[in-house]
Amino acid sequence: MAAIKPMISVEYIGKATVVRFTDEKILEEKDIQALQDSIMPMIESASGGINLILDFGNVQYLSSAVLGLLIRISKRIYENDGRLLLCNINPKIYEIFKITRLTKTFDIYKDTESAAEDLS
């Protein structure tokens, strides 16, 4: 597993690239920018689209700016014929996804294995 700074680790499972957020909090603008700078090149460099699973298992708090980043990531992935799947979302954070109706925008799974299975 390759570590990418600052707050993610990357793993490959079958057809999926799994990005795990390693920090409990994603709140600062500089951290959100760093995430974008780490994830967008993966999307751009994937030939034929990327199947990206974002694993929120460690995340307890996130700012609303992260939701905007997720929408930008999603748009870029779908433009390149890939898929974005989210998993392991904390119940409190999941409530935010429900309130903002992002549960209708994103494919959300219980865990990484379920998400990866959907891609096979």
Language-model features, listed with the residues they occupy:
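Amphipathic alpha-helical interaction surfaces in cytosolic regulatory modules
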Residues: 26-105
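Short hydrophobic/aromatic patches at helix-to-coil boundaries
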Residues: 116-120
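Acidic phosphotransfer microenvironment of two-component signaling modules
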Residues: 91, 113-114
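STAS-typified acidic loop motif
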Residues: 4-37, 56
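Short acidic-hydrophobic, aromatic-tinged amphipathic segments that line or gate anion-handling sites
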Residues: 107-111
